[in-house]
From Swiss-Prot:
Component of the 19S proteasome regulatory particle complex. The 26S proteasome consists of a 20S core particle (CP) and two 19S regulatory subunits (RP). The regulatory particle is made of a lid composed of 9 subunits including PSMD11, a base containing 6 ATPases and few additional components. SMART domains: PAM, PINT. The lineage of its organism: Eukaryota, Metazoa, Chordata, Craniata, Vertebrata. This is 26S proteasome non-ATPase regulatory subunit 11. It comes from the Eukaryota. Component of the 26S proteasome, a multiprotein complex involved in the ATP-dependent degradation of ubiquitinated proteins. This complex plays a key role in the maintenance of protein homeostasis by removing misfolded or damaged proteins, which could impair cellular functions, and by removing proteins whose functions are no longer required. Therefore, the proteasome participates in numerous cellular processes, including cell cycle progression, apoptosis, or DNA damage repair. In the complex, PSMD11 is required for proteasome assembly. The modification N-acetylalanine is found at residue 2. GO terms for biological process: proteasome assembly; stem cell differentiation; ubiquitin-dependent protein catabolic process. Residues 224-392 form the PCI domain. Belongs to the proteasome subunit S9 family. The modification Phosphoserine is found at residues 14, 23. GO terms for cellular component: proteasome accessory complex; proteasome regulatory particle.
Length: 422
């Protein structure tokens, strides 16, 4: 019985590159076959077949079948060790969730697995699955639920020895706080995660996630784009080494750093590099267009890139936030360049030069006047901008402060001399 299963499994593996459907059918037949619990070889072959079948279903985009497989194998899990059962469930669930197929059953399936782990009294597996559920809540923007479950899980994990899972949950907490714009707490959670990670060996995926979050926090809080770039590069190498789909995201963030550092010319060199070449596509093209617009200081090209690559740029909250700031800076630079030769200019004329609506130009000019980017007033009655010369800096206060400082030194000197005489 076991020998026949081994032969079938080997045949299924040999068909992986030529006929995936046939390979899936063979693996299905092995998985559905009843086996004797005391037949170790048959149990091992069935376990390998389940993992191989799960991987194939994920690669071929069969999310519903993969979800069904996860439920179907539960009775078999009682015939293998708890550690192997936990690995099998986690692997299948990770494959299902990493597909990002948006079936709408992700949370439900995860909760079912958690309930099964609770009923079987498998604490470690339950904690691992709850960590995955926190991640799922984060991905579906259910931030309060993510924080609530995450804080419960953290209290449990700090009493136990699973440091890798603790790092994972601390990272998720940091991501959630960042999504809620609570940067101090996001940074504190990240610091905790890095401290815990320093004491253990981090698998490549976890290390890459840690580097990615470090880059995001450095970019968001400190605007330290050079440090952020080095973190994103480390994350990219980590994800690339395990063929993770998140590698392209870290590459996008690397390109974003180059744009924000005012070195858009480096973007082309990065994209055509050996490591990044395999990720060429719409994601990288979007950032290349933004880099070109930034280099040419062209608002029209910038807006065209945002329209043409809406999904790649606007739907990513990290890129969208920073590109909004870049657009704002670019608009200010363009406006200052346009109004520089004038002392009085029609707003209509400015809007025609930079190809933006009159209302948008008026709103931005008002903001710039309030921020003291230049001195002037808007005459809305006549629809003109009146620009004043920059007033000379009044140095009276500086001179007064300098005089007081010098007098203070004289008084101190006289006091020390008088003290010596007494």
């Amino acid at each position: 019985m076991a020998a026949a299963a081994v032969v079938e499994f080997q045949r299924a593996q040999s068909l992986l590159s030529t006929d995936r459907e046939a390979s899936i059918d063979i693996l299905h037949s092995i998985v559905k076959r009843d086996i004797q619990e005391n037949d170790e070889e048959a149990v091992q072959v069935k376990e390998q077949s389940i993992l191989e079948l799960g991987s194939l279903l994920a690669k071929t985009g069969q999310a519903a079948e993969l979800g069904g497989l996860l439920k179907y194998v539960r009775p078999f899990l009682n015939s293998i060790s708890k550690a192997k059962a936990a690995r099998l469930v986690r692997s299948l669930l990770d494959l299902f969730l990493d597909m990002e197929a948006a079936t709408g059953q992700e949370v439900e399936l995860c909760l079912e697995c958690i309930e099964w782990a609770k009923s079987e009294k498998r604490t470690f597996l339950r904690q691992a699955l709850e960590a995955r559920l926190v991640s799922l809540y984060f991905d579906t923007k259910r931030y309060q639920e993510a924080l609530h479950l995450g804080s419960q899980l953290l209290r449990e994990l700090k009493k136990m020895d699973d440091k890798a899972l603790l790092v994972e949950v601390q990272l998720l907490e940091s991501k959630t706080y960042h999504a809620l714009s609570n940067l101090p707490k996001a940074r504190a959670a990240l610091t905790s995660a890095r401290t815990t990670a320093n004491a253990i060996y981090c698998p490549p995926k976890l290390q890459a996630t840690l580097d990615m979050q470090s880059g995001i926090i450095h970019a968001a809080e400190e605007k330290d784009w050079k440090t952020a770039y080095s973190y994103f590069y480390e994350a990219f190498e980590g994800y690339d080494s395990i063929d993770s789909p998140k590698a392209i995201t870290s590459l996008k963030y690397m390109l974003l750093c180059k744009i924000m550092l005012n070195t858009p010319e480096d973007v082309q060199a990065l994209v055509s590099g050996k490591l990044a070449l395999r990720y060429a596509g719409r994601q990288t093209e979007a950032l290349k267009c933004v880099a070109q617009a930034s280099k040419n200081r062209s608002l029209a090209d910038f807006e065209k890139a945002l329209t043409d690559y809406r999904a790649e740029l606007r739907d990513d909250p990290i890129i969208s936030t920073h590109l909004a700031k870049l657009y704002d800076n670019l608009l200010e630079q363009n406006l200052i360049r346009v109004i520089e030769p004038f002392s009085r200019v029609q707003i209509e004329h400015i809007s025609s030069l930079i190809k933006l609506s009159k209302a948008d130009v008026e709103r931005k000019l008002s903001q710039m006047i309030l921020d003291k980017k230049f001195h002037g007033i808007l005459d809305q009655g006549e629809g003109v901008l009146i620009i004043f010369d920059e007033p000379p800096v009044d140095k009276t206060y500086e001179a007064a402060l300098e005089t007081i400082q010098n007098m203070s030194k004289v008084v101190d000197s006289l006091y020390s001399k008088a003290k010596k005489l007494t």
